[in-house]
């Protein structure tokens, strides 16, 4: 199973499946979708209204990886459960942190 992130020269792209209004802000491991794609499962307490859940996801990723919120950009999936995040920084270091988070 390939990880739900891809390394680039100066950033990492992370695929996430977000559950808004999920009772707590946390990651729930890596899952493989029906089409074989992998994603990091995340849940946030925020509701999916006016970008609140997306902001909560960025805050969760920022805190968990120890990076600034401003270094995380939502590339796609603004109104979908499946999202792609661009995270600026050392991609190797970010990948190691994600491996630890995803169990």
Swiss-Prot record:
Pfam families tied to this protein: DUF167
SUPFAM superfamilies: YggU-like (SSF69786)
InterPro entries tied to this protein: DUF167 (IPR003746), YggU-like_sf (IPR036591)
Gene3D superfamilies named in the record: YggU-like
Sequence similarity: Belongs to the UPF0235 family.
Protein name in UniProt: UPF0235 protein RHECIAT_CH0004196
Annotated organism of origin: Rhizobium etli (strain CIAT 652)
